[in-house]
Curated annotation (Swiss-Prot):
Sequence positions bearing Phosphoserine: 154
Positions bearing N6-succinyllysine: 289
Biological source species: Mus musculus
SUPFAM superfamilies: 6-phosphogluconate dehydrogenase C-terminal domain-like, NAD(P)-binding Rossmann-fold domains
Protein name: Glycerol-3-phosphate dehydrogenase [NAD(+)], cytoplasmic
Residues modified as Phosphotyrosine: 326
Role played: Has glycerol-3-phosphate dehydrogenase activity.
GO cellular component terms, semicolon-separated: cytosol; mitochondrion
Location(s) in or outside the cell: Cytoplasm
Keyword Transcription among record annotations: no
Any GO molecular function: glycerol-3-phosphate dehydrogenase [NAD(P)+] activity
Catalyses which reaction(s): sn-glycerol 3-phosphate + NAD(+) = dihydroxyacetone phosphate + NADH + H(+)
Pfam families: NAD_Gly3P_dh_C, NAD_Gly3P_dh_N
Positions contributing to NAD(+) binding: 10-15, 153, 269, 296, 298
Length: 349
């Protein structure tokens, strides 16, 4: 039986870090095709195409410099060509681009293709919240799983020990995806609550922006711990309101929940940029250009999408931390007033 073909849709720093793992495992395990395709948004780097650099030097010099990708990972600039014949699609692009990518892929996939989303964000549809895996699943007609956890891309690429969570309703598919992605230093737990796993990955970025504000304002560890805890409570409350399936508090104790929240509030890019925002007064857009090579920050966008949903449902008052992050980022509320917004939190009433 031929091995399952894998395509990685995306090649930013997280996409490239995952390509390193997937390429290595697919090259080693008989039940995967050793050739892994990776869709790369073509860019010009010093007069050379990024795909050409990746395919000759085996390194994504723009988004994951200093890390060699396995030679069996092949960069392809056309997403349809990259995905042709794939049995497993690994989605890892910024969430605002996923609609356009699905439109391009529609009608070009094999009958039994499955997908896994590593994308942290939510989509705000006409009827409220839509998870990214739902958007992909509906548009492409494929079953979707998710992978979320305390996984800062550079540390995963450096093969430092960490854990992650796969949310998958089908145990056999869950095992297949675990085989594809687990390594001695990238340990995976599979749970069936796909919605809860995914919502953790989206919402923690909002909390991390709040944690960054605390750092930028010089508020110290007690305040930051309170922000993280209140953020976790809002994450759980939001999940219970909006997830269609079961939401058990135990899932928040997996890597996708509290672990991802902690690492993002201490080390992630949302925190770093929010700290600079509080310190310098520069706009988020300006800081994205300066600090992230122009890559988009997920936290503020997710806060905006959530705010629109909460307004629609008349629930803004129940989520003061999420609301404060939105107001500071989009309505010009002074960042110095961030903590005041938390002093009458429903948790304290």
């Amino acid at each position: 039986m031929a091995g399952k073909k894998v395509c990685i849709v995306g090649s930013g720093n997280w996409g490239s870090a995952i390509a390193k793992i997937v390429g290595s495992n697919a090259g080693r395990l008989a039940h995967f095709d050793p050739r892994v395709t990776m869709w790369v948004f073509e860019e010009d780097i010093g007069g050379r195409k990024l795909t050409e650099i990746i395919n000759t030097q085996h390194e994504n010099v723009k988004y994951l410099p200093g890390h060699k990708l396995p030679p069996n990972v092949v960069a392809i600039p056309d997403v349809v060509q990259a995905a042709t014949g794939a049995d497993i699609l690994v989605f890892v692009v910024p969430h605002q681009f996923i609609g356009k990518i699905c439109d391009q892929l529609k009608g070009h996939l094999k009958a039994n293709t499955i997908g896994i989303s590593l994308i942290k964000g939510v989509d705000e549809g006409p009827n409220g919240l839509k998870l990214i895996s739902e958007v992909i699943g509906e548009r492409l007609g494929i079953p979707m799983s998710v992978l979320m956890g305390a996984n800062i891309a550079s540390e995963v690429a450096e093969e430092k020990f960490c854990e992650t969570t796969i949310g998958c309703k089908d145990p056999a598919q869950g095992q297949l995806l675990k085989d594809l992605m687990q390594t001695p230093n990238f340990r995976i737990t599979v749970v069936q609550e796909v919605d809860t796993v995914e919502i953790c990955g989206a919402l923690k970025n909002i909390v991390a922006v709040g944690a960054g504000f605390c750092d930028g304002l010089g508020f110290g560890d007690n305040t930051k711990a309170a922000v993280i805890r209140l953020g976790l409570m809002e994450m759980i409350a939001f999940a219970k309101l909006f997830c269609s399936g079961t939401v058990s508090s135990a899932t928040f104790l997996e890597s996708c929940g509290v672990a991802d929240l902690i690492t993002t509030c201490y080390g992630g890019r949302n925190r770093k940029v929010a700290e600079a925002f509080a310190r310098t007064g520069k706009s988020i857009e300006q800081l994205e250009k300066e600090m992230l090579n122009g890559q988009k920050l997920q936290g503020p966008q997710t806060a905006r999408e959530l705010h629109s949903i909460l307004q629609h449902k008349g629930l803004v008052d129940k989520f003061p931390l999420f609301t404060a992050v939105y107001k500071v980022c989009y309505e010009g509320q002074p960042v110095g007033e961030f903590i005041r917004c938390l002093q009458n939190h429903p948790e304290h009433m």
